[in-house]
């Protein structure tokens, strides 16, 4: 895992024309002075966007997979925009499964999140499963206004039961008020060297992170802390960033263990 300081705008890989599905889904939330509204819900390709009943003052959208994907050669994107004062939560009905496709070209899945002044966005999907033989490049690009609030959960399962991981590359780039807050680039599976060595995953096959950004967060009040029980095969850490933000990273043997650690991290961020 490496943290980068240059070239902060991820660039999707160029793929041959006609090599797979090309689709972009879009969500836009606004605030009309009373409640959060959803003036734009645009489904496309494998993404079906389902409006859910609001909860706790938040508009909610569920992403439902309408077809298999991403497959090799697909170019998929999802854009979500929470306008000023809007409160939006995005979840997923099921895991995203990266599969081998009809072409050797990689699939790309680009997620772009924009959060305006005094707006809140919770991005809480189910895990991404990288199956054997798949080849996926996933990017998150997050742009936050100075007073924006964000909760972002990102989980990967490297291979199904008794299966090796596919070729998975992920990048998370977060800008706050136009300045870099986090830029993280990680690669798993062949041909990436040492991804399953002790410095990265070891024997674990589930990994993830939770990022919480809020103007009210005081990093000094949240010193780094270890997550989980040292005697269990699940480990993590919660640490402050150079800004009003906390980042939890964790590895585990199963998706259930991983979610437990990230939920623990979220509880700790909500504790003064």
Positions of the model-derived regions?
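N-terminal, charged/glycine-rich beta-strand/loop interface patches
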Residues: 2-127, 132
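A short, polar/proline- and glycine-enriched secondary-structure boundary/capping micro-motif
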Residues: 47-51, 99-104, 133-135, 161-165, ...
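N-terminal intrinsically disordered, cationic/polar leader segments
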Residues: 2, 6, 14-18, 22-24, ...
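A structural signal for small-residue-enriched, beta-sheet-centric alpha/beta enzyme cores
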Residues: 154-272
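Intrinsic-disorder/low-complexity, polar/charged segments enriched in Ser/Thr/Lys/Arg/Asp/Glu/Gln
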Residues: 75-77, 137, 245
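Short, hydrophobic/aromatic beta-strand segments
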Residues: 90, 150-153
């Amino acid at each position: 895992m490496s943290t980068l300081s240059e070239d902060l705008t991820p660039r999707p890989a160029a793929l041959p024309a006609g090599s797979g599905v090309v689709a972009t889904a879009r969500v836009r939330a606004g605030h009309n002075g009373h409640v959060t509204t959803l003036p734009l819900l645009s489904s496309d390709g494998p993404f079906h966007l389902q409006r859910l009943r609001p909860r706790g003052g938040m508009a909610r959208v569920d992403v439902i997979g309408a077809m298999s994907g991403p497959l090799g050669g697909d170019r998929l994107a999802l854009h979500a925009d929470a306008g000023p004062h809007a409160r939006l939560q995005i979840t997923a009905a099921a895991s995203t499964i990266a599969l081998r496709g009809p072409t050797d070209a990689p699939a790309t899945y680009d997620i772009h999140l924009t959060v305006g002044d005094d707006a809140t966005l919770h991005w809480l999907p189910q895990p991404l499963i990288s199956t054997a033989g798949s080849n996926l490049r996933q990017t998150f690009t997050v742009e936050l206004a100075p007073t924006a609030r964000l909760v972002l959960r990102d989980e990967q399962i490297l291979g199904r039961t008794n299966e090796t991981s596919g070729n998975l590359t992920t990048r998370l780039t977060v800008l706050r008020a136009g300045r870099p807050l986090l830029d993280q680039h990680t690669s798993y599976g062949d041909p990436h060297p040492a991804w399953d060595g002790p410095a990265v995953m070891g024997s674990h096959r589930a990994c993830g992170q939770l990022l919480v950004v809020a103007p009210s967060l005081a990093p000094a009040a949240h010193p780094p802390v270890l997550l989980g029980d040292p005697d269990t095969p699940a480990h993590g850490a919660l640490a402050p960033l150079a800004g009003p933000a906390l980042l939890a990273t964790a590895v585990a043997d199963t998706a259930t263990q991983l979610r437990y650690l990230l939920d623990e991290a979220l509880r700790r961020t909500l504790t003064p």
